[in-house]
Swiss-Prot record:
Domain AB hydrolase-1 per the UniProt entry, residue ranges: 41-343
Gene Ontology biological-process entries: homoserine metabolic process; methionine biosynthetic process
Swiss-Prot/TrEMBL catalytic activity: L-homoserine + acetyl-CoA = O-acetyl-L-homoserine + CoA
InterPro entries given in the database record: AB_hydrolase_1, AB_hydrolase_fold, HAT_MetX-like
UniProt name for this protein: Homoserine O-acetyltransferase
Organism classification: Bacteria, Pseudomonadati, Pseudomonadota, Gammaproteobacteria, Pasteurellales
Binding-site residues, substrate: 212, 338
Organism (species): Haemophilus influenzae (strain 86-028NP)
A GO term, aspect molecular function: homoserine O-acetyltransferase activity
Assigned protein family: Belongs to the AB hydrolase superfamily. MetX family.
Subcellular location: Cytoplasm
Active site: 143 (nucleophile), 304, 337
Cytoplasm is among the record's keywords: yes
Amino acid sequence: MSVQNVVLFDTQPLTLMLGGKLSHINVAYQTYGTLNAEKNNAVLICHALTGDAEPYFDDGRDGWWQNFMGAGLALDTDRYFFISSNVLGGCKGTTGPSSINPQTGKPYGSQFPNIVVQDIVKVQKALLEHLGISHLKAIIGGSFGGMQANQWAIDYPDFMDNIVNLCSSIYFSAEAIGFNHVMRQAVINDPNFNGGDYYEGTPPDQGLSIARMLGMLTYRTDLQLAKAFGRATKSDGSFWGDYFQVESYLSYQGKKFLERFDANSYLHLLRALDMYDPSLGYENVKEALSRIKARYTLVSVTTDQLFKPIDLYKSKQLLEQSGVDLHFYEFPSDYGHDAFLVDYDQFEKRIRDGLAGN
């Protein structure tokens, strides 16, 4: 199945939360399973920072949730109709900094406006309206996708029955913002960045590659890296280069990332992570969270080095104090933050029960 596209906000522009407007927003999306006659089995999937609209492929390629989706699996395509779209600001089909600005005929680049999670959610809702879906059985997301799911429950509390938030907190921590700052600086200080207007020249590949290497360390655990590499060295490694195997692994991941992601999108989405505030547009966070009516599943991984257990505990407390019907689960995993993408045995029951409302 090839990704599908639709242009939204072509007659009325989207007003952004931090100011500015966007019109003629292309949205790349994909669907899986079959929408039943009652239209009560639809589930929205919200992807993480560098994800896209295709968590699953049926042609031998691996989607980012490939082993979780299919007939009888946690994301059961025999039972549910799944909708997944690339986020606003992304670079996998939905309008973002690398897209053509209809007013100039050139990529937006530095002219792309600042966006927040609330803007992303508005575009997702417009997509569902286009598809004729007025209610969802559930919304599920991990990491950055969990923030989107949380905001959905606040802004449109009657739109869904269940929320499944995996490895994501209500607020991003100071340490995590610090990691993102270093990653952004690696990109911004690349000589080829040119203020974000690099599309007619050489992209800031070195900076983006370095940023990705740092990001990968926050997604993994020390135990996982120790098991995989330890202090093993490369037979052909250079002293100041990839001398240790773990260094070679990170370099590979950094270079691989260049094949599929745009530096400006990375900057904008990292900042959207930092800026996420569920109370934006409301009196305070308690007022915002008190709007939630959905049954809410929140899953924490004790070895997560990005969204740490303390951050999830704080989120748990805020949600409970706001009267949310919260179901909280916590467990360890060698995979750390990325566990929600790969540790099927740990997540299968929580996802299955969360979607069904059990």
